[in-house]
């Protein structure tokens, strides 16, 4: 099993290129199922979750090739098996995103209940209720969502859908289902993440009629068919945020090429409050540590608030900043699993329910630690970069789910880091 060996204490300097966003690429791969014409996606990151999604759609009979330049060419004209089996999706939450497109185009789908995440419950009931409002009949049995249209319907029907909570994958599923539905669909309480806006832009290129993406109310006028398109996946704001925290925590200075400062407002504001200099530059984001950092308290919320996917990484920065801070996690109920591993490095953190209290300005010492989920693994890498001595991060398959060649990019910034097999 691969591990990362980090010898800490080096400031990060130079330039790094931010990859395409995993959380945009996955729904956009599913969106290609909506058309029988060729779709080309560029800037697709080489990640384990992407490889799993490609394997899934190939299993449906779809032609899909991912080349070394990050381009994926898909032709779903040959799709013959509208099923997402458990064996292929048990490691990945995003499998549920196949449900809407398959229902919209074929009127039927059989999708395994998703797996792939240890950080908390993410029930699919909102997906089911929304698609039922559009006329679908869905039965959950034996670990599968079995969906179809009743005999009197040839297409999904437009509807007004208001979810009980903001749901990113739910918004994406409804968006993809609605573009081929009959009539108008209105999504209230819609998620506003940039990745949803990017998905909508791709669908519009395919011929969809969508307004309001990027707001809490999206209106879709259904069309009878969609064509192919070429689309570039938006840059990964979470990867960019991770590198911003790593550079600032190590006292470095770096340019993040392709980084979108307009997608990271809440994180950048906290970094500036901590004393880092962060600015948008032509082609990216510049971050420079300017003296000792000051610990910052924050609360995770839906976009455009502070992202839950950046909670662990910013906590790692707070470990070496001056002062005490409180981190409140409002999105997931089990997202402090990295805390126990940080304690092994000498961190001083206490937790009470969804609140973690961190005493900063600590001297961390390298140790063997274990990744428990995707973003926790990134936070342990950051902690290892600032710790004295060697840190060995185990179970980095979690990291590979969402970061494209992270150790290579960090090494390019001057980190002493290598992948080892033990």
From Swiss-Prot:
Q: Name one GO biological process term.
A: cell wall organization
* Positions bearing 2-(S-cysteinyl)pyruvic acid O-phosphothioketal: 117
SUPFAM superfamilies, alphabetically?
A: EPT/RTPC-like (SSF55205)
Question: What Gene Ontology cellular component terms go with this record?
Answer: cytoplasm
Q: Which residues form the active site?
A: 117 (proton donor)
Q: Where in the cell is it found?
A: Cytoplasm
Known catalytic reactions: phosphoenolpyruvate + UDP-N-acetyl-alpha-D-glucosamine = UDP-N-acetyl-3-O-(1-carboxyvinyl)-alpha-D-glucosamine + phosphate
This protein's record includes keyword Cell division: yes
Q: Main location per UniProt?
A: cytoplasm
Q: Which domain of life is it from?
A: Bacteria
| Disulfide bonds listed in the record | none
**Pfam families, per the entry:** EPSP_synthase
Involved pathway(s): Cell wall biogenesis; peptidoglycan biosynthesis
Q: Which keywords does the record carry?
A: Cell cycle, Cell division, Cell shape, Cell wall biogenesis/degradation, Cytoplasm, Peptidoglycan synthesis, Pyruvate, Transferase
Q: Where does UDP-N-acetyl-alpha-D-glucosamine bind?
A: 93, 122-126, 309, 331
Enzyme Commission number: 2.5.1.7
Q: What class of enzyme is it?
A: transferase
For the ligand (phosphoenolpyruvate), the binding residues are 22-23
Alphabetized GO MF terms: UDP-N-acetylglucosamine 1-carboxyvinyltransferase activity
Known role: Cell wall formation. Adds enolpyruvyl to UDP-N-acetylglucosamine.
Which family does the record claim for this protein? Belongs to the EPSP synthase family. MurA subfamily.
> What's the protein called, per UniProt?
UDP-N-acetylglucosamine 1-carboxyvinyltransferase
Q: Which organism is it from?
A: Delftia acidovorans (strain DSM 14801 / SPH-1)
